Amino acid sequence: MKKENNITELVFILDRSGSMSGLESDTIGGFNTKIEKQKKEDGEAYMSTVLFDNESSVLHDRLPLDRIPKMTARDYSVRGCTALVDAIGDAIHHIGNIHKYVRPKDVPAHTLFIITTDGQENANYKYSSDTVKKMIERQKEKYGWEFLFIGANIDAVETAASFGIARNRAVNYHADSEGTQVLYETISAPISAMRKNQAISNTWGAQIEEDFQKRK
């Protein structure tokens, strides 16, 4: 079905579990730089930011992109375990319900989830991996949602595949200062592509993968 607008729904699911300790300033700086760059681009966009450890908290809930404030150390502090599956499941459920009940002409033409984690799921209690996989596959097939998965200290490609995310939409990264910088520099391109009504390149994560392989 042809959409009646060129609105982009952006959903960032960011790991803030204890293993991210020491990368707080890099994460905050990279996030803010990416947002400021996107504010200069054309196209209407709503943005949600979900932070997760052993539980999820919503930092931004579908705010217009140009109204996203800078992230601070008060917003992003690390703690706890890694309830990745629950964070993804909650976010899909929330955004899906909003799209279900708004006027058809107001449903964003494009929806992009960007998921970053530096470890294996170890604290889910709401959703199973199989349930989230079915949710992701449904949103992809029925509504054309896109999902990018960026993981450290795990096999990101295999983990993404277990969630129903295509292998060419997943990439491994190093959870250190340099790797975090490369991550945020790289993800601007697929965001921009969606906002311009273009397809995300299958090589969107090449710079991240190159850094990972170079320092493996």
Question: What kind of region is each of these model predictions?
Answer:
Residues M1-K216:
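Acidic, low-complexity intrinsically disordered regions
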